[in-house]
Design a protein with these regions (language model features):
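Short, glycine/charged-enriched secondary-structure capping and boundary segments
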Residues: 23-24, 42-44, 95-98, 133-137, ...
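Short, highly charged low-complexity linear segments
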Residues: 65, 176-178
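Flexible beta-alpha connector loops of hexameric P-loop NTPases
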Residues: 88-98, 157
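Conserved C-terminal guanine-recognition region of P-loop GTPase G domains, centered on the G4
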Residues: 77, 102-176
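Conserved G1/Walker A P-loop phosphate-binding module
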Residues: 1-92
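Generic secondary-structure boundary signal with a strong preference for alpha-helix termini
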Residues: 69, 96-101
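Conserved short-loop catalytic and cofactor-binding motifs
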Residues: 53, 93, 120-124
Length: 178
């Protein structure tokens, strides 16, 4: 088991040239707007470092957090960055701003050399959406051998028991923070 020792906000960037140098391995949280990326990051880090809101499009920049974890069995530390990306899809922004986001995000996820894991968050109440399938397919299209994709289904607490059972049967793992 690993446990977070500490986490801190590093910086926000609107494009890859503003990002901190890729020194540590990186884990990217991505998905549709308002799927719970920032909330999940805060839950995992047991903090309120990532700004979250019920308003879609709250995260408008690429946010970097440095984290240090302790392996409880070996007492060894592991340090890596967590990256909170703006949501894909709906947000209360202009069309021009949305296009700039898409361009910046594409450049970031395809060119950032230290990304090792893409955590693709999917709202468990809205499975099979084209936007989620497209995102997964895009990630697979450029995935390197040293990278992985992990699908995480959020908002499972809003499902009925039979819907939760179907989600579990199809995907195998269900976790909660309550």
């Amino acid at each position: 088991m690993i446990k977070v020792k500490n986490a801190k906000f590093i910086t926000s960037a609107s494009r890859i040239t503003q990002a901190p140098p890729p020194i540590l391995s990186e884990v990217v949280f991505m998905g549709r707007s308002n799927v719970g990326k920032s909330t999940l990051i805060n839950t995992i880090l047991d903090s309120n470092l990532a700004k979250s809101s019920s308003t879609p499009g709250k995260t408008r920049l690429i946010n970097f957090f440095e984290t240090c974890w302790e392996d409880m069995q070996t007492n060894q530390n592991l340090t890596f960055n967590i990256i909170d990306l703006p949501g894909i899809g709906y947000a209360k922004v202009s069309k021009a701003e949305m296009e700039q986001w898409k361009k910046s995000l594409w450049e970031f996820i395809t060119k950032r050399s230290n990304i090792k894991l893409f955590i693709h968050l999917i709202d468990s109440r809205h499975l099979g959406l084209e936007i989620d399938e497209n995102l997964y397919n895009v990630l697979e299209s450029f995935l390197r051998n040293d990278q992985n994709i992990l699908r995480v289904f959020t908002k499972a607490d809003k499902l009925k028991k039979n819907e939760l059972a179907k989600l579990y049967q199809k995907n195998g793992v269900i976790m909660g923070n309550k």
